[in-house]
């Protein structure tokens, strides 16, 4: 696997994003996520949540451009947020708290069997940045 050196486009949630070049700091964070997850990443999606009013609806990351059953590493910076998983068959719901500096790794059949979301909350008044490291197949 190689880091993609030229910008490319990536689509999700009915939007198209144009990739930017890797910075040295981002490469260091990517390498940390790779060491923990055992995956080799070639893309990073950055989401900014200005406060708790912003969140993400139930979904699974099943875009055709992603490596099937590849690990996704999600790093959180800023406000601590509650993150939810819901099993697609049993509807069991599990919550985890994403603290500043934490890394959540979703791997194997997680995307096949579970939905996940970042629920909105009025209790959070500060920002959170999420870096989601992924492997895009070329």
List each language-model region with its residue ranges.
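Non-heme Fe(II) oxygenase metal-center motifs and adjacent flexible, charged/small-residue loops
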Residues: 1-138
């Amino acid at each position: 696997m190689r880091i993609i050196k030229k910008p490319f486009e990536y689509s999700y949630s009915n939007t198209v994003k144009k990739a930017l070049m890797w910075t040295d700091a981002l490469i260091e964070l990517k390498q940390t996520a790779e060491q923990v997850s055992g995956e080799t990443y070639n893309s990073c999606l950055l989401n900014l949540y200005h406060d708790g009013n912003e969140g993400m609806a139930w979904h699974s990351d099943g875009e055709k451009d992603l490596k099937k059953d590849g690990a996704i590493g999600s790093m959180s910076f800023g406000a601590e947020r509650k993150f939810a998983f819901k099993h697609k068959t049993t509807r069991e719901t599990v919550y985890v708290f994403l603290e500043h500096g934490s890394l959540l790794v979703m791997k194997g059949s997680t995307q096949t069997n579970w939905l996940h979301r970042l629920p909105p909350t009025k209790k959070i008044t500060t920002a959170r940045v999420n870096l989601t490291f992924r492997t895009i197949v070329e």
